[in-house]
Structure formats: structure tokens, C-alpha cells
UniProtKB/Swiss-Prot annotation:
Keywords: Cell membrane, Membrane, Plasmid, Transmembrane, Transmembrane helix. It comes from Escherichia coli. Pfam families: KleE. Its main location: membrane. GO terms for cellular component: plasma membrane. It is a multi-pass membrane protein. It comes from the Bacteria. The chain crosses the membrane at residues 47-67, 81-101. Residues 11-21 have a biased composition (Pro residues). It is found in: Cell membrane. This is Protein KleE. Residues 1-27 are annotated as: Disordered.
Length: 109
């Protein structure tokens, strides 16, 4: 047996909707703060520059962070050497830049 598909019958096109008068023009937007556009443009520029060099920068930061980790392990019980804090700072920077490139996207791009 075959499956018979019934096509819809041709129907009359729907009646056009009545034309409504145009809405009044919206009030002009409030002026932007002078520094806001500058900061947004600067963040956008930094983001684009970081994204362009990210493949190389990621490797360099990862190698430096790994070196700081090994240095932290070597100087673990040495008084006066703050290698743990150095590693934490490098790791935080690597994490922050990874977030900045991967998740954050400036408005207007």
C-alpha cells in the first residue's frame, strides 16, 4: 500500500490588514557621557588586539605559568621567597585573559 498525501486546496488570500496611522516620533535619546564612548572604544581595541595575538600569547603565558608552578614547588619551604604568590598572580592573569578572549565580547562587534 502506498501513503497518499493530500495537498491543501488553493484558498483565497487573506484580506489585507487595515493601515494604522504611524506612531509619533520617539523622543531623542539622552546624550552619552563623554568618557563612556572612549572607554568602550579602548576596551574594544584591546579585545581585538588580544584576540589577534591569542594563539601565540596563550602558549607563552602557559609556559611562563608552568615555570612559575615548578619554581613554587622548588621554593616551597624557603623563607622569604614568595614563589607561591607569583604563581598565583600568573595563573590569575592567564585565567582572566582566557575569560576575556573566550567569553567576553564587546558590544558592537
Amino acid at each position: 500500500m502506498s501513503n497518499i498525501v493530500k495537498f491543501p486546496r488553493a484558498s483565497k488570500p487573506p484580506a489585507p490588514e487595515p493601515v494604522q496611522p504611524a506612531a509619533p516620533a520617539a523622543a531623542p535619546a539622552a546624550p552619552k557621557a563623554e568618557g563612556r564612548g572612549l572607554v568602550a572604544g579602548l576596551v574594544k581595541f584591546v579585545w581585538v588586539a588580544t584576540v589577534l595575538v591569542w594563539p601565540v600569547l596563550k602558549w607563552v603565558l602557559a609556559i611562563i605559568t608552568f615555570f612559575q608552578f615548578v619554581r613554587m614547588l622548588y621554593h616551597w619551604n624557603t623563607p622569604g621567597v614568595y614563589a607561591g604568590w607569583s604563581f598565583l598572580a600568573y595563573f590569575a592573569a592567564l585565567t582572566a585573559i582566557t575569560y576575556f578572549v573566550s567569553i567576553y565580547k564587546p558590544k558592537g562587534l
